[in-house]
Amino acid sequence: MATDSKSPTVDKSDVTARLPKPSNLGDVVTDRTKVLTDVERGQLEEQNKRMVTPFQAQKLEHEARKHWDLFYKRNDTRFFKDRHWTTREFSELLSENPAVPGTLADGTRRNDAENQQKTLLEVGCGVGNLIFPLIEDGHRDYFIYACDLSPRAVELVRKHNLYDERYMRAFPCDITTPEVFGTVTEHSLDIVTLIFVLSAIHPEKLPAVVANIFRLIKPGGMVLFRDYGRYDMAQLRFKAGHKIGENFYVRQDGTRSYYFAEDEVATLFRQAGFAVLLNSYIHRRTINAKENIDVPRIFVQGKFQKPPQPE
């Protein structure tokens, strides 16, 4: 269900005076919510003039799987670009030695207790734009589980030339329900990735999702999170008739998107029992040279850990 679109882009830092100095990756990292201009406040007010009706909103919820299946029927594997950036942003995804699973950086073998294969679950795997770049880049330390609400997306993952059930398993799943426990056992995962997926879920169901993930993950395991941030350009551009609720919208194709505040993400994970290791807004200026477009993007990025068992 991932929703970061495919386009030729070049990222530059956001030089807005209100924000701190950009990081060396060209991003601006901050815990402050964007300050709206008068024009931007007017855009949000316009959205309220015609809201999605409660009947329409309920219908969208019931038909969420259908809309994502239709999305992948239209777009197949062409819509999203491969996420080779994830290992740059989340070093936890890196293998100790990409060439030899179970080997440390100096070439020595880990002991038997340490040599157990790590397990990773990508929630909202789409067509595999995170997991297959990991494999292509040599990070094969994991047994990978990959799930998506859309059975069509999962079928596209299974058809990929790198799909191999010796070290991965893709399956359809509604992560808002206990359905996932039919495939993945409790306390079995080292890492769970949530990359542009929670935004596609009704905000009222998010606590249940994070609670399920807490049950799945091992003590000391990690959740890696990235999603749309409050007042992102895409949120401001919605017209009247697309707003379902506060910061929650429907696109033309029937898929939905929520825009997160940094503090609500932290609260969501803390209430489920996670420790917040990192959580902040990422302000990025995205330039589409082909279309001569220069737009500011806002994401929330975080790392959340299930507390380790006391020794």
PLM regions: where:
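N-terminal auxiliary segments of SAM/dcSAM-dependent transferases
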Residues: 2-70
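Conserved alpha-helix/loop element of class I SAM-dependent methyltransferases that forms part
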Residues: 79-117, 133
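Class I SAM-dependent methyltransferase SAM/SAH-binding core
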Residues: 114-181
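A short acidic, Gly/Pro-enriched loop at the edge of an enzyme's catalytic core
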Residues: 180-192
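A short SAM/SAH-binding and catalytic strip from SAM-dependent methyltransferases
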Residues: 189-205
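A short glycine-rich, Lys/Arg-flanked "PGG" loop and its adjoining helix->strand segment in the class I
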Residues: 207-222
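C-terminal alpha-helical "lid/dimerization" subdomain adjacent to the S-adenosyl-L-methionine
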Residues: 229-291
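Core SAM-dependent methyltransferase catalytic element
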Residues: 274, 285-311
